[in-house]
Structure formats: structure tokens, C-alpha cells
Amino acid sequence: MVDATPIRPRSAATVTKWDYEADVVVAGYGIAGVSAAIEAARAGADVLVLERTSGWGGAAALAGGFIYLGGGTPLQKACGFDDSPENMKTFMMAALGPGADEEKITDYCEGSVAHYNWLVDCGVPFKESFWGEPGWEPPFDDGLMYSGGENAAPFNEIATPAPRGHVPQMDGKRTGEKGGGYMLMKPLVETAEKLGVRAEYDMRVQTLVTDDTGRVVGIVAKQYGKDVAVRARRGVVLATGSFAYNDKMIEAHAPRLIGRPGAAIEEHDGRSILMAQALGADLAHMDATEVAFLCDPQLVVRGILVNGRGQRYVPEDTYSGRIGQMTLFHQDNQAFLVIDEASYEEGAAATTATPFLRAQPKWAAETVEELESDMGLPAGALQSTVEVYNKHAAEGSDPLLHKKSEWVKPIGSPVAALDLRGFTLGFTLGGLRTTVNSEVLHVSGEPIPGLFAAGRCTSGVCAGGYASGTSLGDGSFYGRRAGISAAKQN
């Protein structure tokens, strides 16, 4: 529920007293906010972070912890993988569109190795080991994994596959509760605190404050139910996350997510976007959404995914986020996994970070014809799909969707189907249009003076597609830029 407090900007002339003051004021203490705070402090600014909850972390601390980095990071090299900024850009432009921001992606790829080194210098630990199994994330403390379908069709023909999912090393991870994202946030917050960054908690930002020239000079927030005014002598950085939990904004901009659970935190209510919009800020890719597919990849890769017509529609060995998008956007959220008994048992016994996503078969039969009938599919629909798949699988190929040969195996008997209809949830990727220096742009195309933003409240490197790690990667990368830019203001 969005607060009913007026969102129109306040005039500084109406502020009788500033309750807090700093050179740079950062709204949000997640990955974008902490990165902005560190760089602003290193640039000599006095920094104050306003956090809505009672502690740092945001969605980042609950995330699996993937940071999308490449171009030849020390971790990639240590694990035996070659990559270059150009190769990374080729993949990202193909996978993150349509309409991907080429200037941002070029900038991000060229700065990726330096960004990895920055994280390491801030104390973020990475183990020099690669996890090569299908999965949402490494189940152990391995530091590198494929996280965007780079090694699956069609991307493995477009760019040379290289794993770019960098995960902070952490013991005792619990997916969705305390993931690798915690070990990303903890050292960064400690770095910020050593630099003298201050934080005020239970601060719900309400609106921006501008002077008579239109420059952003502060924020009005609610702290413990009381309005407080916070002055920013140099600049304000917005870093409060997406609008995944604002039903009104979802209905207006990303209606494909209506009724789908938000894969975010409830504090992601879009307030920063609305605050900046009230100043005339431009938006980009507000319809863009990531969609998670809720079935363990170790099972999915060993069967075939079919839609409500019994037809395959996606290579099963690709990134689960891509499967989710293809299912929700193009198959009316209808999906079934057809798999034989031997393959199901093999997948169920495989090591995974998400054993709780191992769905049980709903239907089982001795023949595909019986299974098809039990599922209520038109006679011959599933049979023809399996027949074509098995014909080529006998030779270890998949000319239809190009699943890699290592996962291509004829479907035998007995055979079962998992009912995965509606097994998707998502979060928003669109937001404020920003420059590579994290300046928030007015609809006129000019930067709004004194206002910067980063993270999921902005439109970053993802314009439609997604790869795990682009949120934490983009948020930290452009969070740093926001802090530097804000600190430079007079």
C-alpha cells in the first residue's frame, strides 16, 4: 500500500526546519544505496542513508547473490574461462532486449573487471571454483556459474559462452532466506561504516524538496509516523527498489504480472519512481519483467517442457528466468514437464540448491498415448511431440530447439507429467531513465539537477530479457556512479 502523503515536490521555502542534513542523501540501504554511499564518502562527501526498514540489506541481502560480471574477471580466469568485454556485450545485447541500452551495456561491460576488483577490495569474498550443474544458484560456496543461458540456444551460437554469475562465498546459504546476497551486503555496509557513512532507519521517503531553481535539495520522509525534512547539500540518490509491490503501477505498466506473486520484497512499492515522476522524470521499459519458473532445473533439463497444446516451446537447458518469460508471456502460463521414470529419479537425486522446487508428477502412465489422454490433451498432440523428439534424441540431437546433446535422451517408459501451470512469479525491471553517470533524466532529455538514481527503481541494462546477477551487478555498478556524481555537485 503506497502512503497517501502528497507526492508532489515540496518547495524548500516551506521547510521551516531541517531535521537531518548531509552532503549526499541516499534513499535505500540495499545494493545500489550502499554502493552510492561508499563512493560518495570516498569522494569526500558527508553521507546519510535513509532506510525504510529497521536494518540494512533490502532485497539484495535475501537474494542468491549473483553479480553479473565478465569481460575476463580474475575469477573467470582462475576457473579456466576466457571472456572479453566485446563478447560479454554481444550476449547482453542479444539476451537483455529488445530495446537494450547499448551505451549502458557497453559501459557496463568495459568496466566489469574493474568493478569485480572494487567488490573484492571492499571485502566481498569469492571462491575460485565453478559450479557447472543446472540450477538456480550454486548449492555450495562455489563462486562462478552460468546465470543467463549463455551456454544454451540461441545464445551459444551468438556469443562464445562464458559463465558470468559471480557469487560471494558463504556457508549455510538458505535460498530465499539468507543467500549469497547477504555476503555481498555485509562487507559493503562495513566498508561504508568505516568511511563514516551515517544511517537513519524506519525512514519512509515521501517526496522530494526543490529550491526556486528546480534543483533537488532534500527529501521529506516519515520516521516513526512523524514528517521529517532531510537536506542534501550536494545531491539526492534514489535507490529504493522496484515497483513489484505497487498493484496500481503493475496494472498500469506491467499487467502480465497481475496476480503473480512478487519475487521481491514488499518495500518495493515504486515510491521513488513516483517522487521523481512528480518532477517530470522520464521512464523506460516499465513493461519489462523478470519471471521465475518454479521447478528445479535438475528435473526440467532431463525432460521436455510442453504447453497447453502438448508442444515444446523452449530449450529445457536454458536459464530458468528465460523459461519463465517464455511460459508466462507466450504460453498463457501453461507448462507441463514430460519425463520418464529413470530421468525423474536421476534428477531427483542430483545435487541442487532448490530441492523444495522438486514438483511431484501429477499423471503417470505406461505409454505417451495414455499420458496424453490422462492430461486431457487432444489425441495425437503429445504423441507427435514425443515422437519427433525421440527420433532425433536417438542420435543425440535436438534440431527443433537445440537443447545441448548432453541432455538429449529419448523419453522412455513409464512416463509422467508434472503440472506446472501457473508456476511463475516475477518482478519489474523498468524505472527511471538515467544516464551512465546515474543522473535522472527529465522528459525533456535534460538531467534533473541534484537528482540521481540506481538499482531497480531505474531502467538499467535489462530492457526485456534478464540474466541472474544483472540486478545486483547493475545496482552496484551504477550505484557507485550515482555516489560519485552526487558528491561532485557544488
Question: What are the language-model segments listed below?
Answer:
Residues T207, R215, A381-G465:
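A glycine-rich dinucleotide-binding beta-alpha-beta segment and adjacent secondary-structure elements
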Residues A22-V49:
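N-terminal Rossmann-like FAD-binding beta1-loop-alpha1 element of flavoenzymes
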Residues R42-A63:
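Glycine-rich FAD pyrophosphate-binding loop
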Residues D107-G225, D247-K248, A393-G412:
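Conserved redox-cofactor binding core of oxidoreductases
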Residues G179, Q223-F293, L472, Y478-R481:
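Glycine-rich loop(s) and the adjacent beta-strand/alpha-helix scaffold that form part
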Residues L69-Y108:
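Glycine-rich active-site loop/strand segments that organize a redox cofactor
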